[in-house]
């Protein structure tokens, strides 16, 4: 136990609280059993736990009634261990030679590599003999039994290798049409072509079907908008606003009174003037005719309009430009080519059967008959007899 920490100064002794005695639960009949432990809050169990324990005890009793040695683990341990030892002994007897698990496969692979090396060396020796070109043909050749055995093994290895190559060639994926078709389709969908191209084509077809009903309505609307848009005036245009007013067509006369025109004299009924209008008329003083104010005021200059000198050259160019514009307006516009709508383009072309039949008859009429062929043949023989046709030699 660790020593209590040291404290310095005035130490006041604290009063220890008295320990409380455990609370005992009185029995039903007022008598306490000494054999049983006192029931405290820690060892009290609920009714459900007691019920489970009682059920387990009943199961144990049933099992013991069927087999008295069912819970005798120490007595059964020797039997269990004896069964395990018997199984190990059987496995040991079956594996008398104690063959390795992977050694046999490794030995076979080593023998195969040796045969490959012998085959390689033999091909190399054959090439060297071909280069010698019979230089050592007069010498004796010694062949041992081991060499013959080695040659036989190499021959078997080559035959086995040829069979494997033929089998692999026959079962190759490249020669399987089904796999080839699937691989080609995958390449087309994933590599050679954008995978979203099919979706885009479907969306375009849907849009075309929607526009079939509308026809050329959108194109007609665009043409009308272009015609209705006023021509923008350029800052370099020399035409004044007076010329524009003169070029405009005269407007129809307007009535200055309400109602319809009748036969005879139509009197204009004047409206009664208000008090403010009468005051304005009374205060109005007309200017004399000799006043400079009556002189025509120049029209307000438009934004971006530049004043230019009126030279004879400029006026001549202006007159020529006006003349060209008048001739253009008088000349009839060439007829516009009819626009074929998208709906007409998508419709299948109609084939005139009568015209097609006439064309076929004209083609067949140009063919030679047997009589024409015989006549041409006779003419050829006549020209050859006369020496006009020289046969090729």
Curated annotation (Swiss-Prot):
Keyword flag Cell inner membrane: no
Gene Ontology biological process terms, A to Z: regulation of alternative mRNA splicing, via spliceosome
Biased composition (Basic and acidic residues): 222-236, 243-261, 317-333, 341-350
Coiled coil recorded as keyword: yes
Region feature Disordered, mapped onto this chain: 1-49, 187-350
Keywords: Coiled coil
Source organism, top-level taxon: Eukaryota
InterPro entries: Nsrp1, NSRP1_N
Pfam name, any one: NSRP1_N
Coiled coil: 76-166
Basic residues compositional bias, start-end: 199-209
Chain intervals with Low complexity compositional bias: 39-48
Family annotation (PANTHER family): NUCLEAR SPECKLE SPLICING REGULATORY PROTEIN 1 (PTHR31938:SF4)
Protein family: Belongs to the NSRP1 family.
Name of the protein: Nuclear speckle splicing regulatory protein 1 homolog
Species this protein is from: Caenorhabditis briggsae
Classification lineage: Eukaryota, Metazoa, Ecdysozoa, Nematoda, Chromadorea
Gene: ccdc-55
